[in-house]
Amino acid sequence: MEDNRIQNQIAIYMTNKKLCEFTDKLKPAPIEYYAHMHAQGEEQADGIRAYSCIGVVLQDYSNGTGDKTVRVTANLSPGFFPFVLRRMQNDLDRFDFTEDKIFGEPDEHGLSTVTKLSVKRASVGNDGKPRNYPWCVIVENGRAVKEKTATGGTHIKSGTYKKQRSVYVNINDLDFFNLIYRTTRFIESWELTYGPKLIRDARKLLSEQRAAAQQ
């Protein structure tokens, strides 16, 4: 009997050539930062810094499946989805969001992983006609040199980025709404599942620490 594998897929849009998928990569904050609820890069007990996010997967199999499929990935913060949903509920005409990230340890050539993500909506095309598929999601994966900023962060060093793969998916209003709505509801359900226990455990620990300090 084949094992029933647990899938982390939240929502998916698929045609005969393209795929857009959102996946569960949410992680609770450590108890020391319980009020964050979502992990935001705080150091965990094992020394690793974790981030709570929603995975984005785009695939282009217009040239074939298997080795011919182009697959790209990126991550979005949990707050992105209720933000977009609220904008969509206010009769959104245009939307423009871009985000570039560089992370991971450099390889033997000094290059780290780069993701470039773009989510845009344009109700009218360049020809002035209404667009049937006004939403466009673009993800690009590549490599670049990671450079530290004056404030201690990191960014892509100018002139070092090398694109490896890129996929775009055009989506109509209803299908994009379903993607965003289902993902937003999942995030809310996740928060209601993990949040209460995290808060209770933190409050209990805080009370114990205060009681010990008064002895």
Model regions and ranges:
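N-terminal "first-domain core" detector
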Residues: M1-T69
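Short, low-complexity cationic-aromatic patches
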Residues: A45-A50, A74-L76, G128-P130, S166-F177
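Short, well-structured alpha-helical interface segments that form or flank functional binding sites
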Residues: Y51, K68-R71, N75-N90, N178
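A cross-kingdom feature marking solvent-exposed beta-strand/loop segments within repeated
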Residues: L58-S77, T154-V169
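Eukaryotic short linear interaction motifs
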Residues: N63-T65, D93, V145-K146
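Acidic, metal/cofactor-coordinating or nucleic-acid-engaging core segments within structured domains
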Residues: G79-S112
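Short, solvent-exposed interaction modules
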Residues: N90, E105-K163
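Mixed-charge, glycine-accented linear interaction segment located at domain edges/termini
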Residues: A144-Q215
